[in-house]
Structure formats: structure tokens, C-alpha cells
Amino acid sequence: SANLTLLWVRHRVLGGSARVTERIDNDVPTGAVYIDGKTWSARSSTGEIIEPDAMVRVIRMEGVKLYVEKEA
């Protein structure tokens, strides 16, 4: 079912490392990351702009949008 799929995806990506493929700017709003073989819409959990190719960590998921922060 769709709910089981969403739970599986959540388990796979939460806390995971992703590569930014489209500049993340919450004001526009734009942003995408690549993780686990798929590209996802993304927003910055801190509000900072994150440039393409930066590595980020997935903090939370709302619907099909990932909230990320830059890796240290």
C-alpha cells in the first residue's frame, strides 16, 4: 500500500546523506537532492541557501519533500 511504501522510504532516507542537485533556496522556493537512487524536492531546515553538489543530511520528511542541513 502507499502508506507502507512511505514508511519504507522514510526509513531509507531519514538521517541519510544526500547530494544537492538543484540550489536549495526556501525563499524562491527551489531545491532538490539525490539520495537512494532518486531525486527529491528539498528545503533547508535552517533556512540557509545550499548550492549544488553540497552534501547534506536529511533531517525530516513532510509528504514528498525532504528537509536537509549541510553536513559538517
Predicted segments with their positions:
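Short boundary/loop segments of OB/S1/cold-shock single-stranded nucleic-acid-binding domains
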Residues: 1-13
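Terminal membrane-proximal soluble interaction domains of membrane-associated proteins
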Residues: 10-72
